[in-house]
Structure formats: C-alpha cells, structure tokens
C-alpha cells in the first residue's frame, strides 16, 4: 500500500466511507468538467438545457468506468453549436480508449465522430464502412436521398 492507501484504516469504517465519498465526488466533478458542464455544476438539472442534460447523462454513464458507451440519438433536438460540443465530447471519450456506439440520424455528427458506420434502412443493413465509403455508397444515396440528382 502507498502512503494514502491505508488512511481509512486508521480511522475505522466511517473514515473509509468518507474517503470513498470524497473520491466519488471528485470523480463526479472531473466527469462534469470533462463533458463541458463545469459552469453549471451547482444548477438543478431541471434548470439546464436538454443538450446539457444529455451531456450530464454521458458523464453519469462514464462514472461506472464502462468499456463501451451506447448513445441513442444523442443529438436529437440539438442546434449546430450543441452538436459540435457533443462531437467534441464523443471524440474525447474515444481518446480515453472507450468504445462508443452511436445510433443517430444526424449524418453530419456520425461522419465527424465515427471510424466505421453501419447504415440501416427499415431494419435491414444496406451498407457498412468508413465515412468516406458510406458517403459514396449508392444504396445509401438511394435510401436516404432518393437517388442521385
């Protein structure tokens, strides 16, 4: 054990619980900062925007130290600035070595943050590949743009 590893042993169970609580609070603060919400840390969740609430949910998911984060339509209802903030958070999550699975209709976001994309049309897989491959795929163009114009 290192110097701080047994500090809770000297104070008994209550000291250990306090040390763990302090660690959890510090981790929560770090994750709130990580998703860009440091300025609203003390606000009630009912007073922050829906985009900020989604970022807070991402921070909450990250608190469990997962290997995979699943984001189901995280950009729904977001304006361009909020989508850009979300894209930056997703990129930083990936830089931490976490896998991110995004289900999303906003193709700009998908093209920006994903290395590999699977495209579904009415529940059927019609394409899979890198963003640049998906953008040129005739089945994707037909399904989502109604053909080449």
Give the location of each predicted region.
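Glycine-rich phosphate-binding loops of nucleotide-dependent enzymes
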Residues: 1-149
């Amino acid at each position: 054990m290192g110097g701080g590893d047994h500090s809770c042993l000297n104070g008994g169970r209550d000291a250990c619980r306090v040390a763990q609580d302090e660690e959890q609070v510090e981790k929560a603060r770090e994750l709130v900062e990580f998703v860009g919400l440091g300025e609203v840390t003390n606000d009630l969740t009912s007073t922050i925007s829906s985009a900020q609430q989604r970022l807070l949910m991402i921070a909450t998911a990250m608190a469990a130290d997962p290997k995979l984060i699943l984001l189901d339509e995280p950009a729904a209802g977001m304006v361009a600035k909020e989508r850009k903030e979300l894209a930056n958070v997703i990129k930083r999550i990936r830089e931490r070595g976490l896998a991110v699975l995004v289900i999303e209709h906003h193709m700009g976001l998908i093209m920006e943050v994903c290395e590999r994309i699977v495209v579904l049309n009415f529940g059927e897989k019609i394409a899979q590949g890198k963003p640049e491959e998906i953008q040129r795929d005739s089945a994707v163009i037909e399904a989502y743009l109604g053909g080449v114009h």
